[in-house]
Structure formats: C-alpha cells, structure tokens
C-alpha cells in the first residue's frame, strides 16, 4: 500500500503571492494525503485548502475526509471558509484538533465565521461537519494509523505521524510549526527532544518547519519556529530517509529557498550522511 501526498500550501504565517514565490508557492499550509483504499486525509487548512477544494468539487460529490489541524493559528485554519466542498450537501468532514488548546477547535472555527468577520455563518454550511479532539495517542483510520506528539509552539501544537496500516515500515511525519532551538516557556521537560527523536525515528519522510536561517532565529527566539539547519539535525538524529523543508517564511523568495536547500545538502554532505533534502512546493507530489 502507498500513501500519496500533494502539497497545496507551503508558506507560513501569511499568504505570500507574487512573482518571487511562484515556484514554491504562496499559500499557507495544506497537505493532501491519499491511501490506496481511497481515503482522503487533509493536514491543516490554510489558504491552500481552497484550491484543493476546487479540485475535489471537480471530481464530483460525496466527498468524505478527515482534517487534522496541527493547531489553531490563523495560517492553519483561514482556508476553511473558502473550502467549497464544505458548502455542499452530502459531503462529510471530521475536523481533528488538539485537546490541549485553550479553546475547543469547534469554537475557534465557528468564531472565524462569525458575522463580524465573515458573511456566511458556520451553521449555514450544508456538509456534515464533526469536530473531534485528539490527545497524544494513536488511532487507526482507513488504511493508515496516526499518532500525535506535542511540539513546541505558542498556544500548543501537534505533530503527526502517519503509518501505512499494511506496511508499518512506511510512514511520514508532519510537523508544521515547532521550535527546536529552545525549550524555555513551553514546559516540555528535559527529555522532550529525545522523545521527539523517538517519535520521528525511522520515518520514510519528515515534513518539518524550516522558517528561519540561523541569523533570523536570533531575532525570533520563542516565536515557535525552527531553522532549516535544526530541521536537518533532527532528521539526521532520527534516521529518516528524506526531509522536506516546510512553512517557508513569507519574505523568502524562490531563489532564497533554493539557497536554503543547497545549504542543507552541504551540511548533510559535510557530516558524511545520505539524507535527501528538498523544499515543499505547491503541486509537489510524493509517495511513501
């Protein structure tokens, strides 16, 4: 069995359209996952989910999907009111959010569609939408097993590991927002990084926050994001096969991202390792 991935949004914090971002994309986070059984999983609902929705509607009705949100910051939920399938009867969606959030994910999504900020209320949606809370636990889906891990990000966030139900050695980890460079203020505990490495260990693919350069991080410590060098070191420590840099800084141009990828590959080479490194781009497809 194969898990098939497609990136619909790769940018962090705020959409960044324009001529400098056409290759890697300007939409905020959204990743589509398909299993051989036909199940649809959506990771995060940034502005990238709008184009995913248009694609799904073009394929017909009767759409069913599980949407796993890493957390409730704007760039990970702002596409939901523009997700066309959610307005159509006969479609069904389960939206999963962290149990550790200060406010339920149900309340957060409803509030972003309140009349003062959006013209169509949540209760006017015609699809069936169910909200569920996920703790740090493992559960089985249609053709996959998903587990979660509490990462370091203001307000709380989760990373997810998806494993092929029929082939446990095939798995990928999705960690969109995570600060690897500091632990103070998060209450993670002394063994947090070791536990994170164990969570990621042996994955076929790691999609990880790579928002900052080392120089940029010095000015943004505590903001909840990692450098691309830190992402490489996590991937190496965990023995993953492939690293995909994600959550690109809005100001980062396509050429800048190319330079980050080149620097990561040089770092891997200096350490004598074979980790494959690339950067997430809208429209990019991968198989696990």
Question: Which stretches of residues belong to each language-model region?
Answer:
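Binuclear metal-dependent hydrolase catalytic cores
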Residues: 1-173, 181-186, 197, 257-288
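Cap/insert and terminal regions of metallo-dependent hydrolase folds
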Residues: 179-275
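Conserved beta-strand-loop-short alpha-helix elements that form
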Residues: 176
């Amino acid at each position: 069995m194969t898990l098939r991935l497609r990136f619909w949004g790769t940018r962090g914090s705020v959409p960044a359209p324009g001529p400098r971002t056409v290759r890697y994309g300007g939409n905020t986070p959204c990743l589509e996952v398909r299993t051989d059984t036909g199940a649809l999983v959506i990771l995060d609902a940034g502005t990238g989910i709008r184009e995913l929705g248009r694609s799904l509607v073009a394929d017909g009705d009767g759409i069913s999907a599980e949407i796993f949100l890493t957390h409730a910051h704007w760039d990970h939920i702002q596409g939901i009111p523009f997700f066309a399938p959610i307005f159509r009867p006969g479609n069904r969606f389960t939206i999963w959010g962290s149990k550790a959030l200060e406010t339920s994910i149900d309340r957060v999504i409803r509030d972003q569609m309140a009349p003062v900020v959006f013209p169509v209320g949540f209760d006017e949606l015609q699809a069936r939408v169910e909200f569920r809370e996920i703790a740090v636990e493992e559960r089985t889906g249609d053709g996959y097993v998903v587990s979660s891990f509490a990462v370091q990000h203001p307000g709380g966030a989760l990373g997810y590991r998806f494993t092929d139900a029929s082939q446990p050695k095939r798995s990928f980890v999705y960690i969109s927002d995570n600060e690897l460079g500091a632990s103070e203020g998060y209450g993670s505990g002394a063994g947090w990084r070791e536990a994170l490495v164990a969570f990621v260990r042996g994955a076929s693919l790691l999609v990880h926050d790579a928002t900052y350069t080392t120089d940029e991080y010095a000015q943004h410590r505590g903001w909840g994001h990692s450098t691309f060098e830190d992402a490489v070191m996590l991937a190496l420590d965990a023995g993953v096969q492939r690293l995909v840099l994600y959550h690109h800084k809005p100001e980062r141009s396509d050429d800048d991202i190319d330079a980050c990828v080149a620097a990561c590959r040089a770092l891997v080479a200096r350490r004598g390792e074979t980790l494959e490194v690339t950067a997430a781009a809208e429209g990019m497809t991968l198989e696990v």
